[in-house]
Structure formats: structure tokens, C-alpha cells
């Protein structure tokens, strides 16, 4: 079973609130999850300490078992001071390079 650390949306219309959850990769975004390991409230100011709240010990455990974070959650984990496995860092770098290449191709087409 592939396990991901990802965001599950909650809150009201136009007022998002996300739970950081450990879930089976095949499960729906807001469906069943194995464990809740934090919250993310994008409505709060970026310098607010309650904007991103993570259970660091549980995230370290799940990363150790092979769970892969999504890009957004990986950024939160790095900001919290936790280290990501090298494999995850490499995947993030490759995705960033591909994104830059796509955007530069699109800019060249438009020009």
C-alpha cells in the first residue's frame, strides 16, 4: 500500500481549512485517512504560528516508514525544520526543473 502525506480540505465555501493527513495514495482527497498529523489554515497571516501546525514526531515516523509527502506538505515539513529523505528531495528538484522548462517553452511560444 502506497502511503502519502497530503492535505485534506475542510472548512466552508471560500474559507478553506486543511488537515495534514496520512492516507492511502488511492483514497479520495477528502476520504478515509490513517492518521491526522497536523493542520493548515491559509486564511491566517503567513507569520501566524497557528497557520501550519504539525506533529513532528509522527511525521518523522511516517517518513521513516516510506510515506511520500506532496509538494506543498514537503515545503511545510522543511519549514518546520524536519529533514526530508534524499529520494523525496530529488523528486522535488526534478519536478521544479520540469516546471521551469515548461514555463520557458510556453513563454517562447507566446513571444
Curated annotation (Swiss-Prot):
One of its GO terms (molecular function) is structural constituent of ribosome. One of its GO terms (cellular component) is cytoplasm. Transmembrane segments: none annotated. Gene3D superfamilies: 3.30.1320.10. Residues 92-111 are annotated as: Disordered. Keywords: Ribonucleoprotein, Ribosomal protein. It comes from the Bacteria. It holds the Pfam family Ribosomal_S16. PANTHER family: 30S RIBOSOMAL PROTEIN S16, SMALL RIBOSOMAL SUBUNIT PROTEIN BS16M. Belongs to the bacterial ribosomal protein bS16 family. NCBIfam families: S16 (TIGR00002). This is Small ribosomal subunit protein bS16.
Amino acid at each position: 500500500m502506497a502511503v502519502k502525506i497530503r492535505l485534506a480540505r475542510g472548512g466552508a465555501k471560500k474559507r478553506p481549512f486543511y488537515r495534514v493527513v496520512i492516507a492511502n495514495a488511492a483514497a479520495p482527497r477528502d476520504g478515509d485517512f490513517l492518521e491526522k498529523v497536523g493542520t493548515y489554515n491559509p486564511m491566517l497571516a503567513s507569520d501566524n504560528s497557528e497557520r501550519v501546525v504539525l506533529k513532528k514526531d509522527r511525521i518523522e515516523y511516517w517518513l521513516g516508514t516510506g510515506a511520500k509527502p506532496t509538494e506543498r506538505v514537503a515545503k511545510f515539513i522543511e519549514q518546520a525544520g524536519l529533514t526530508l529523505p534524499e529520494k523525496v528531495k530529488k523528486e522535488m528538484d526534478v519536478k521544479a526543473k520540469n516546471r521551469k522548462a515548461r514555463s520557458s517553452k510556453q513563454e517562447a511560444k507566446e513571444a
